[in-house]
Every structure is written in C-alpha cells, then in structure tokens.
Amino acid sequence: MYAFKKIFAAVVVTAAATVTLAQTPAEIDSALKAAMDKYKDIKEGANADYIPALAKVDSKIYGIALVTVDGKIYTTGDIKSEVSIQSISKVFTMAKVLEEQGPASIENNMGVDATGQVFNSIVAVEQYKGAEMNPLVNPGAITATSMVKGASRDEIWNSILNWYGEFAGRKLGVNQEVFKSESDTNQRNQAISMLMFAYGHIKDKPLQATDIYTEQCSVNVNAKDLAMMAATLANGGKNPVTGKQVMKSDNVPDVLAVMATAGLYDDSGKWLYHTGLPAKSGVGGGIIAVSPGKFGIAVISPPLDKAGNSVRAQKAIADISNALGGNPYSVKAH
C-alpha cells in the first residue's frame, strides 16, 4: 500500500508540473467571490460541540484564501478571523517527522492506510494493534507527535510551533481557551495514546505526547495562514512568499498521498472522487486543499457536516478548483 501511495502522489505531482494556472488575477478573484456569495447564506451543519470552546465560535465566520505557487495571494470574506487549526495540524507534524526521520518512520510506526473507522476510533487501534493506521487520524497523529525530536516537552513544542510558522510565513500562537477546553475533555485521546504505547508504537511518555498533540490542535490560524501552508506543499515544500525551502521536495508526495486518501475523515474517498485534490479538514472549521504545482487554498467556516468537515469549505473549494482547473487528474488529451 505504501508503494502505491508513493506512485499515486508522484503521478499527481508530475501531472501538475506539466500545466500552469492559466487564469488571470481577475478571474481568480471572481472565482473566490462567486463561491463566497453562493454559500454565505447556507444554514447547513453545526459547530463541533464535543469540545466546549468550539461550540462557542461564531458560526458565521466565512473566509476564503488562495495562494499560488508564484506567491500571489487572493482573499475574500472573514480573512482576519482566527480559529483553532485542529486536525489540519496533523499534516504538518507528519511532515516534520518525515523530515527528521524519513518516510520509513511513518510507515513503520503508524502506517499509511485509511482505517475505515472514525478519526478517534479505539476499535481501529485494537483491530490493527496500532499498525495499519495513518498520521491523519488521532492514533497515528499522537504517535507522530511523540516522535518529534527534543530534549524536553518545551523544546518539542517550540520546534512544532516554529515549524508550523515556517509554513504559514509568520509566527503563530495558541488559543489558550481552546487548549484548556480540549485538555479538560481529552480522556479518549489519553486512552488512545496509552494503547499505542502498549502496542509499542509510542516509545515513551504517551500522556506527554497527548498533551503536546492537544496544544498543536489549539494553534490559532486564519484562512490566509492555512492557504499559505497549503501553497508551500503545492510548491514542493518551498514557501512561495518567504522563499524558504521549509521541507524537502522529495517528502511532499508522501504527505499529499495520505491527505488524498485520509484527509477528510469518512468522506475522503467521496472528496477525492469529486475534486481530485489532496486535502485536510479540522473540526475548528478549516479545510486546506492542494493543487500541486498550482495553488494552495483554504476556507474557514465552523459549521460541520456529520463527518466532521466544514460544509461551506467543501462546497467553496470544489467550486473554486473547478473554475481554476485545479484537479490534477483533469488532463486533456494531446
């Protein structure tokens, strides 16, 4: 399966590299504004409420941002409004472990397969004994966090936070209210981490790993931050605005492959079928998507569907990508 994912991602990146974004700035702006106007009044979905602080977030927040691989930034809506990054953080912690320890570390410690279970499933851990998971569901994500190098809890945490900031192009901070709220209610994740420890995938300090994981999910971001992070992946690991090579380009396909197959929880297959875009959602209301070689896009809107994905974000990203030819599999015959 891992070899398949490598080939899958390589095909995406190669196909995307043969095409460029043909639309003018005015056409890109128009695509964003059309999606904003089309979906701003829909009433579907509801905020996540299993984390009390998320239930209180303004459900009317709706911001869209797109960053091209040549560093052009397009935005509309509530672009300054911040939400907690939540599970989108998993993408970038996975990327950090890849950089520090190589691709085999991901496959060997938590796997790269979709589990067929909900993102915080204990059943999946027991069924697969902690293997055959992936870094974008909670068992794999907490394991990935436990693998980040550092001599102390603070050193590990600062390394993760600074890493996220390099993708976003600015220093990021933590929403302390969300962090406390999640910490008070994360007993399930504590249980998951102990199981992963029992099966030998987390090597040491499972509860510390859970605590750091909870803090990484509480990082505040706006739509522009998320689009910049996605665009860095779209640009082969190089931030298109700061110009910094944040991660090795060779590691980007591994990240995109898991995003494509497991990025939107139970609806990952449906999403990929309709858009072709590697993506990742978070229960804070954000979704990022990557059109390799073209752009990164992000939408923030807290109301979620039953799968835990932002309703507006899915619709808006699909429309914008369709308008801009973002699907890497949509290739015309020559």
Model-derived regions, located:
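Active-site-adjacent helix/loop patches that line small-molecule binding or acyl-intermediate pockets
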Residues: 24-34, 42-44, 97-216, 232
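Short acidic-glycine loop/turn motifs at beta-strand connectors
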Residues: 68-72, 291-294
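Active-site SXXK
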Residues: 64, 71, 83-107, 229, ...
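Beta-lactamase-like hydrolase cores
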Residues: 23-64
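Short beta-strand scaffold segments in enzyme catalytic cores
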Residues: 64-66, 288
